Amino acid sequence: ESVSHDIGKTRIFTNLSLCVNKNEKVLILGRSGLGKTSLFRLLLGFEQAGSGKILVNGLNLDKAHVHQIRQQLFYLSQDIDLRDETLNNLVTEIWEFNFDRKLSRETIEQLLTFLELSPGILEKRTGDLSGGERQRIGLLIGFLLNRPIWLLDEPTSALDNAMKKKIAEHLLSLDKTMIIISHDHCWQDSSAVRIERWS
């Protein structure tokens, strides 16, 4: 609410107000340099606003609540950064970390099938993945973590058109709150999203 933000001497935005309701899907459109990614960094507590108030599920985004808020968020960055390890190790860590529900190996295999990834990809190291594979593994991590709020920065940019449409339709059907930054028409053409145009 009424958030202003600077990086160095550069003003990113002034008096920004944005309300996203539970399970709502909001698509932010606008050219580069308008602060769309900075909005995500503010919500994650990686950057601090110069003025204004940020609330996430009723919690004020401050040092006292930032860890609690991050536990509610899943962030898929445009350039997803994965530790250099095998995907099997990465998935196992997430599996063991997720205390909210039981994750079976069958569930993971079903997700891989949906993402059109073979089970053998789990033997690959993260550094050996193509751009499209990295993006789909990022989405796999999101499904496994099962957080209530998703921040998606160009989540389908490296995928072909058929996969873009498949992923967008599925994500928009989930009972999740989502803020999406994307130039892909699969998001813009959906009636399930509220479009915010920044200029």
Residue ranges and their predicted role:
Residues L44:
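Helix-to-loop junction immediately C-terminal to a conserved catalytic motif
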Residues L139-L140:
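Hydrophobic anchor residue at the start of the ABC signature
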Residues R125-L129, E133:
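Conserved ABC ATPase signature
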Residues W150-E154:
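Catalytic Walker B motif of ABC-type/P-loop ATPase nucleotide-binding domains
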Residues G52-N60, I69:
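Conserved ABC transporter NBD signature motif
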Residues L103-I121:
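Conserved ABC ATPase "signature" region
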